[in-house]
């Protein structure tokens, strides 16, 4: 479940009156009135830099609902972050009436080479898509205070971010043929030992629901965090990665017990437990083409003689809200018209009769509505004279 909409919907439900009207209607009404988000894009003057260079940038700040220049924020914060995740410099940029701003960073010789990050955000963007990364006491004690540690392990999904290499300055001016990066000074931060193979599973819709058929995506990483291609088995079926360490498979989820997958990597066999099976919830499978997206739903362990809803959000705005009632087997099918959605990523959320999110799924829409129109130029005369 994406954090921004799960948290947003739960906050709305918590504020509903006890003697509620139709909770689905209230959810729909509040989603329609959801605050408009902002988006930022930074245009840099280059794709890579050398120590001693200047990084010039131009910023574009737009409203997420229509991609027009923002009329909300007038201050933009732009940060340069070192390869080890520490803040090098933060700049405050004034956003003009056209949603633009500009500035530059100096890559001083005191910095070391490596992959740097530049990120940009407005204060308003900090209200959306917040994720707290898990951390232990040992890692938090590496910071000067709790606030620094909290900021380091907090991720804002709406922040614009771009990573680029910074190379060592060449020995002779103008000799840029050889680009090299010198390893940064060694730190004494203890490195946690990692398994040689790590596999993470992502059930479609967010959960494995007992007694349903599920599609499960997975990603395989080695001890250095690099994606690797592997083969294995799950529930008697052969599974394998399809591209850059990622793959998917379908599985019949049993009513009881646990599921596991077994992989062979570099001569060693690894067993991984799939996410816990839940007795109550909604299994979601989405099929889509150019015209429509069809959500196949299977609800288990919940009341069936009640209305549920599917909400579709794009650009932070509610684009579709459909009610449905599952059949006697708990199954239902909801069709989304993709022609009515803007190009980009949309989020489909299944909501129960109490207004709580049950499952969600991202899907992509490409309607070519951002393509620039051709301009035709014609003259009113064949010849012109001074």
Residue ranges and their predicted role:
Residues 1-26:
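Bacterial Sec-dependent N-terminal signal peptides
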Residues 22-386:
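A structural signal for beta-strand and strand-to-loop patches characteristic of beta-rich domains
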């Amino acid at each position: 479940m994406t954090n921004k909409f799960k948290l947003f919907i739960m906050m709305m439900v918590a504020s509903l009156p006890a003697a509620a009207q139709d909770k689905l209607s209230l959810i729909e009404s509040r989603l329609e009135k959801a605050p408009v988000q902002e988006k930022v894009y930074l245009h840099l003057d280059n794709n890579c830099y050398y120590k001693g260079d200047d990084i010039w940038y131009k910023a574009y700040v737009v409203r997420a609902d229509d991609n027009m220049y923002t009329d909300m924020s007038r201050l933009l914060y732009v940060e340069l972050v070192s390869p080890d995740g520490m803040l090098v410099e933060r700049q405050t940029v004034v956003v003009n009436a056209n949603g633009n701003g500009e500035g530059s960073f100096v890559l001083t010789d005191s910095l070391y080479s490596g992959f740097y990050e530049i990120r940009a955000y407005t204060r308003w963007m900090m209200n959306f898509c917040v994720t707290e990364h898990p951390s232990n006491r040992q890692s938090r004690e590496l910071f000067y205070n709790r606030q620094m540690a909290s900021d380091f392990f907090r991720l804002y999904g709406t922040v614009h971010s771009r990573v680029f290499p910074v190379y060592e300055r060449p020995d002779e001016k103008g000799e840029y043929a050889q680009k090299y990066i010198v390893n940064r000074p060694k730190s004494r931060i203890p490195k946690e030992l990692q398994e040689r193979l790590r596999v993470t599973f992502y059930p479609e819709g967010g959960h494995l629901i007992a007694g349903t058929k599920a599609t499960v995506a997975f990603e395989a990483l080695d001890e250095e965090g690099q994606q690797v291609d592997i083969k294995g088995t799950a529930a008697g079926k052969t599974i394998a990665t399809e591209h850059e360490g990622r793959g998917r498979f379908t599985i019949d989820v049993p009513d009881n017990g646990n599921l596991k997958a077994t992989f062979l990597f570099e001569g060693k066999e690894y067993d991984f437990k799939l996410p816990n099976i839940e007795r109550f919830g909604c299994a979601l499978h989405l099929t889509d083409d150019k015209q429509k997206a069809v959500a196949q739903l299977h609800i288990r362990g919940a009341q069936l003689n009640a209305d549920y809803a599917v909400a579709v959000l794009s650009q932070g705005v509610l684009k579709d809200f459909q009610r449905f009632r599952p059949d006697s087997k708990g199954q239902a099918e909801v069709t989304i018209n993709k022609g009515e959605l803007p190009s980009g990523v949309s989020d489909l959320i299944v909501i129960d009769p109490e207004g709580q999110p049950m499952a969600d799924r991202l899907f992509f829409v490409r309607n070519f509505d951002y393509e620039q129109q051709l301009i035709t130029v014609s003259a009113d005369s064949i010849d012109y004279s001074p």
